[in-house]
């Protein structure tokens, strides 16, 4: 091995396989851009984002870890959400859940 060399496996990296997903349409009704990170509880996002929040409970964006989706003012965008894994316990964000889903 050469210092700094990468040894990568062949093939694609699969994430969120077997988890529940849902596609929703989101509108930014505000006057400023809103960016949502990969692991933010989508149900608790900025109220200027208009969408069916009941579908988003316990869900996050289905994008690679560390990525985000930006919603420009007035923009309508379709996004895919994926269910949180683990014990389904959510704390923080806007403190709307603070416990088990």
Swiss-Prot record:
GO terms for biological process: urea catabolic process. GO terms for molecular function: urease activity. Pathway: Nitrogen metabolism; urea degradation; CO(2) and NH(3) from urea (urease route): step 1/1. It comes from the Bacteria. It catalyses: urea + 2 H2O + H(+) = hydrogencarbonate + 2 NH4(+). It is found in: Cytoplasm. CDD domains: Urease_beta (cd00407). InterPro entries: Urease_beta-like, Urease_betasu_sf, Urease_subunit. Its EC number is 3.5.1.5. Belongs to the urease beta subunit family. Heterotrimer of UreA (gamma), UreB (beta) and UreC (alpha) subunits. Three heterotrimers associate to form the active enzyme. PANTHER family: UREASE. This is Urease subunit beta. The gene is ureB.
């Amino acid at each position: 091995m050469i210092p700094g060399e990468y040894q990568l496996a062949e093939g694609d990296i699969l994430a969120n396989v077997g988890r529940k997903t849902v596609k929703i349409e989101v509108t930014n009704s505000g006057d400023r851009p809103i960016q949502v990170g990969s692991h933010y509880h989508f149900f608790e996002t900025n109220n200027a984002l208009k969408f069916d929040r009941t579908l988003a409970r316990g869900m996050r964006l289905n994008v690679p870890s560390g990525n985000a989706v930006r919603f420009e003012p007035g923009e309508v965008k379709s996004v895919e959400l994926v269910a949180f894994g683990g014990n389904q316990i959510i704390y923080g964000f806007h403190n709307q859940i603070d416990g088990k889903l």
